[in-house]
Amino acid sequence: MGLCKCPKRLVTNQFCFEHRVNVCEHCMVQSHPKCIVQSYLQWLRDSDYISNCTLCGTTLEQGDCVRLVCYHVFHWDCLNARQAALPANTAPRGHQCPACTVEIFPNANLVSPVADALKSFLSQVNWGRNGLGLALLSEEQNSLKAIKPKVASQSAVSNMTKVHHIHSGGERERTKPNGHDAVSPHSVLLMDAFNPPSAGDYASSRRPLLPRQSPIGGTDRDDNKYQRRTPAELFSRWTRRFYAPSSRPPWRRTWFLVTAGILAFVLFVYLMAWLGRGGSDAVDEGWNNPNPQPNHYE
């Protein structure tokens, strides 16, 4: 589990293999539409990845891509050609992900930005509309090249209110007494009831009253948190803990300093005693020898 770096600050267990950051579904649609995203545990087991479409073998940077609800990414043209080749009477459960055999069509009650972006792709083709329960397109419309929707469409994940101005009376014109044409527009308010603005969205736009000091190691927490630390960095982090503001009671820090001082003093006394005994070993060895040999003088 990790915290996404977007303003929503959502807790997620999904991890971007390319950028090595935790990502939520909103970021998958907006900022990481073509990245390889799987669980963080999967990245710990095997961090190697191939940023190619498994259907055609080419890189995902070429062409529009679609992300399924299982978070696997494919070229939309490749996936559309593969699923369109199936029989017309194929059940929705027969359309499965080529990588993990999970059903392509999301559940009707699933509230997810990834599912909304996927539905915008599926609604452009007949096999997708059939699985979603929508009316099929005519043969002429189906033969024409469908307009490819944007993967990072704001309408799929936006929480803002959309106001559409339409003309009343079925686009019928009304004429004023002075002869000028006038149209009486009215507004229809469509609100997104699934994703209301959270309190974090309002709090992110507020400026703090006082500057907040970054925690120890906070400058490189997101960039270098997976790199191996050097002994110098570990020692500097340990020494800075004495000066960094802490929420712990002050007596704990005093107790730690006193204990560390006592241990250092005991170690110093033991070291000096050991060095003192080492210098007198040669003298004591002569007095304690049970078989002394007198020196012979010529």
From Swiss-Prot:
Gene3D superfamilies: Zinc/RING finger domain, C3HC4 (zinc finger)
Zn finger intervals (RING-type): 53-101
Matches recorded under InterPro entries: ZFPL1, Znf_RING, Znf_RING/FYVE/PHD
SUPFAM superfamilies documented for this protein: RING/U-box
This protein's record includes keyword Signal: no
Membrane topology type: Single-pass membrane protein
Keyword tags: Membrane, Metal-binding, Phosphoprotein, Transmembrane, Transmembrane helix, Zinc, Zinc-finger
Protein localization: Membrane
Zinc finger (B box-type): 1-43
Region span, Disordered: 199-230
GO molecular function: zinc ion binding
GO cellular component terms, semicolon-separated: Golgi apparatus; membrane
PROSITE patterns linked: ZF_RING_2 (PS50089)
Predominant place of localization: membrane
Membrane-spanning segments: 255-275
Keyword Lyase tagged: no
Membership in a protein family: Belongs to the ZFPL1 family.
Protein name: Zinc finger protein-like 1 homolog
Native organism taxonomy: Eukaryota, Metazoa, Ecdysozoa, Arthropoda, Hexapoda
